[in-house]
């Protein structure tokens, strides 16, 4: 199983360069998404990509209902680890990790799963922490 950052789901819904790889990843194995990253996915799809909320729900709910995509809530342990990761790695200019990024990394590290992302900062910290990475192309097609 792989933990998905928000971007892979945005790419899937907005038909961006990583969409085919995300589809393959979901076909091959179940994937997880922290609820904070699911929220970010929905927000970006609506606010930035101007996708209607109904279309987003129609695309994501079947994946969630059949268990192809599992939404995972964050608890106290993930909160402590995410805060520790952000305190150790965050730098506004060189390594701008959001709290959502850190929760993604905390879930992946605690479960022993890989992360799928196109975010260079997430990839750098994941590798530093011994977390496996599925590096996806970003919205321009560039792979980190």
Give the predicted meaning of each segment:
Residues 35, 73-75, 137-139:
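Residues at the C-termini of beta-strands that transition into short coil/loop
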Residues 105-144:
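Acidic, PIN/NYN-like endoribonuclease modules and their adjacent C-terminal/linker elements
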Residues 69-121:
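Active-site neighborhoods of divalent-metal-dependent phosphate/nucleic-acid chemistry enzymes
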Residues 1-37, 48-62, 129-131, 140-144:
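Short, well-structured N-terminal submotif of metal-dependent ribonuclease cores
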Residues 42-88:
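Active-site-proximal, substrate-binding regions of enzyme catalytic domains
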Residues 20, 43, 80, 123-124:
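Alpha-helical elements of the RecA-like P-loop NTPase motor core of helicases
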Residues 8, 43-46, 104, 122:
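Hydrophobic side chains within alpha-helical segments
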């Amino acid at each position: 199983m792989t933990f998905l950052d928000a971007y892979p789901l945005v790419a899937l819904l907005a038909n961006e360069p990583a969409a085919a790889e995300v589809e393959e990843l979901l076909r091959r194995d179940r994937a997880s998404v922290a609820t904070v990253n699911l929220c970010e996915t929905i927000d970006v799809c609506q606010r930035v990509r101007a996708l209607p909320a109904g279309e987003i729900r129609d695309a994501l709910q079947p994946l969630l209902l059949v268990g192809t995509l599992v939404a995972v809530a964050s608890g106290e342990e993930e909160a402590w680890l995410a805060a520790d990761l952000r305190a150790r790695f965050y730098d506004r200019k060189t390594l701008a990790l959001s709290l959502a990024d850190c929760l993604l990394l905390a879930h992946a590290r605690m479960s022993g799963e890989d992360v799928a992302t196109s975010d260079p900062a997430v990839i750098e910290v994941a590798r530093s922490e011994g977390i496996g990475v599925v590096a996806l192309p970003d919205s321009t097609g560039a792979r980190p």
